[in-house]
Amino acid sequence: MRILDETTNKSVETLTLLLEKAEAIQLIGYLEQLIDIAPGTHHYHLNNDDYSKEITISLYDNSNLNCFSDRYKLLITKDE
């Protein structure tokens, strides 16, 4: 698992998500879709109602690192 704070561009150790039920249902749906396709080929953005908050989710493994930007490769390989 890798977590990036896009604002500070730093890896994050812990994260708390507080979701409304509709957001949790949407997140589950996105995760199910990601599991059904090849890792790294797609990602999803989960936003709140006014788009002021966003969670981006994607699947990765060692075979698909080339699908990611250099920043994400560093995060995935070194957790930096």
Give the role of each language-model region.
Residues 1-80:
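Positively charged, low-complexity terminal tracts
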